[in-house]
Amino acid sequence: MITAETKDGFAVELSEEALDNVELLDALAAVQDSDVLSLGRTIRLLMGKEQTRKLYDHLRTKDGRVPVVALSNALGELMESFRAGKNSSSSPA
């Protein structure tokens, strides 16, 4: 399992197999190409429906919105944290 955390404290734990998904790779590529409509799908593919709902609730503003920029930033931070966690877990002890 790999644990990732955003800078504001949202944490999620995933198996390494969750990252081995070509559909996730396609969705990440679309987000990288500035296709913001792929952002929600990317998060769901990465974390599943329940964890996605928790992230949305974590990012939700007082007026009930989940800002696109906040979600995009969270995705970047989670991917960065997953990479760091994967690298540290595979390093020799």
Give the ranges of each region predicted by the language model.
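Short, surface-exposed, charged amphipathic helix/loop patches that serve as local interaction elements
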Residues: 10, 15-93
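Short acidic, Pro/Gly- and aromatic-enriched capping/linker segments at domain boundaries
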Residues: 1-5
